[in-house]
């Protein structure tokens, strides 16, 4: 409300106007104690307000800092630079990620609320999407590092909106929330999952259990949405490999059941995509290198937590074991009279060795490694058999 004083027109807030009315009464017929009770102030504060109103008139009830620039306010140059940086270079970052980048790359320590206020005033910044939230119970984290890993694929336009959609296959520890290794592939395939596990086991060891969805490469699925174990179900190549390594498989029935892993995927989609864009990376191989060398270590430092039990649950694999011979799809073939086998719509000619000139009638094991190479082993000696594609 506007109040005229002398030749000046003052704009008072409602609480300031009420304070002025009471103080004016205190200057005539109202006691200081009564005014203090009405304004929820101490008598000493009322005496100070009476003195200010006598000296300044209605301006005496206005706070002294009103209209002043705060001492901690950022300069206009910083404000303009932050808004310009977001619009030109960081337009696909969320605000938290943008604040971190300002501090780390440009040494501009600006708070989240300040940046958010500046961007909203400039009609910029990310647009929030309202999500319908349902009540769910939080599951406690596992106690030990390596006790339980999430392995999941996240399809997204990771390499840019104009690039084909790719899938990030990511292994994440449940106890610490730290991502361990990831790889980009066209789809979430068996070989892609084996490749990620190979790097995890090489670097950390064998985990206690894997928490997975019911994708076809992990377990046998039925049509019509029924995921019921039946007697005629045969184990998948993935289940056979994990059984060999004594790694337990735990299957989730919905994305909500894998909430912690799904949130990690969401964090990667918000943060990794703009970082790959700024780095000029548009191909899967360099994106995988950047992911594991730069991005994952930073995410682990920023969001990882300490496990409740400091002793790790990872186990060392046997020293003599070549993991590639376990993390693969295995099948058997009968050798024909001309020392050939049929595999993947091709005829493979088995080549003789010094100690085994012929394998006619034998059953050999064919392994498809995750690097898409084919390896054939002798049925009795397990030695590798050389071969070539028969034309």
What are these regions (language model features)?
Residues 1-21, 68-77:
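Short, Lys/Arg-enriched anionic-surface-contact patches
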Residues 13-30, 79-90:
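Short, amphipathic alpha-helical "recognition" segments used to contact nucleic acids or chromatin
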Residues 34-39, 98, 102:
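Short alpha-helical "recognition helix" segments of helix-turn-helix
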Residues 57-151, 156-157, 226-229, 233, ...:
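Basic, flexible linker segments flanking DNA-binding modules
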Residues 108-109, 120-179, 186-208, 240-244, ...:
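Mobile-element integrase/transposase regions
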Residues 201-230, 252-255:
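Acidic/histidine-rich, metal-coordinating catalytic segments
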Residues 231, 237-325, 365:
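Charged alpha-helix within mobile-element recombinases
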Residues 294-391:
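C-terminal, beta-rich DNA-binding module of retroviral/retroelements integrases
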């Amino acid at each position: 409300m506007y109040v005229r004083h002398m030749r000046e027109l003052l704009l008072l807030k409602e609480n300031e106007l009420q304070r002025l009315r009471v103080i004016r009464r205190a200057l005539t017929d109202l006691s200081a104690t009564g005014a203090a009770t009405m304004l929820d102030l101490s008598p000493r504060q009322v005496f100070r307000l009476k003195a200010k109103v006598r000296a300044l008139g209605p301006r005496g009830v206005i706070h002294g800092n009103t209209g002043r620039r705060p001492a901690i306010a950022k300069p206009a140059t910083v404000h303009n630079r932050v808004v310009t940086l977001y619009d030109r270079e960081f337009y696909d970052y969320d605000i938290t990620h943008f604040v971190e980048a300002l501090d780390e790359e440009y040494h501009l320590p600006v708070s989240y609320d300040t940046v958010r206020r500046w961007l909203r005033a400039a009609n910029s910044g990310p647009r929030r999407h309202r999500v319908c939230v349902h009540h769910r119970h939080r599951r406690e984290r596992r106690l030990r590092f390596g006790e339980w890993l999430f392995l999941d694929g996240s399809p997204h336009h990771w390499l840019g909106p104009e690039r084909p959609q790719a899938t990030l296959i990511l292994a994440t520890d449940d106890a610490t929330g730290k991502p361990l290794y990831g790889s980009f592939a066209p789809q979430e395939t068996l070989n892609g999952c084996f490749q990620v596990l190979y790097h995890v086991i090489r670097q950390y060891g064998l985990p206690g259990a894997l928490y997975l969805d019911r994708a076809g490469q992990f377990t046998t699925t039925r049509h019509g949405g029924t995921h019921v174990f039946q007697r005629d179900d045969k184990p998948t190549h993935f289940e056979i490999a994990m059984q060999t390594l004594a790694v337990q498989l735990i299957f989730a029935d919905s994305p909500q059941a894998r909430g912690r892993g799904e949130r990690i995927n969401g964090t990667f989609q918000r943060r990794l995509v703009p970082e790959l864009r700024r780095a000029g990376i548009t191909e899967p191989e360099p994106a995988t290198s950047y992911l594991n060398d730069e991005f994952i270590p930073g995410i682990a430092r920023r969001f990882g937590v300490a496990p409740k039990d400091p002793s790790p649950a990872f186990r060392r694999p046997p020293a003599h074991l070549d993991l590639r011979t376990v993390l693969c799809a295995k099948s058997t073939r009968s050798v024909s009279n001309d020392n050939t086998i049929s595999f993947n719509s091709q005829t493979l000619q088995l080549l003789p060795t010094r100690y085994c000139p012929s394998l006619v009638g034998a059953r050999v094991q064919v392994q498809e490694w995750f690097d898409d190479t084919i390896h054939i082993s002798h049925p009795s000696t397990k030695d590798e058999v050389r071969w070539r594609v028969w034309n």
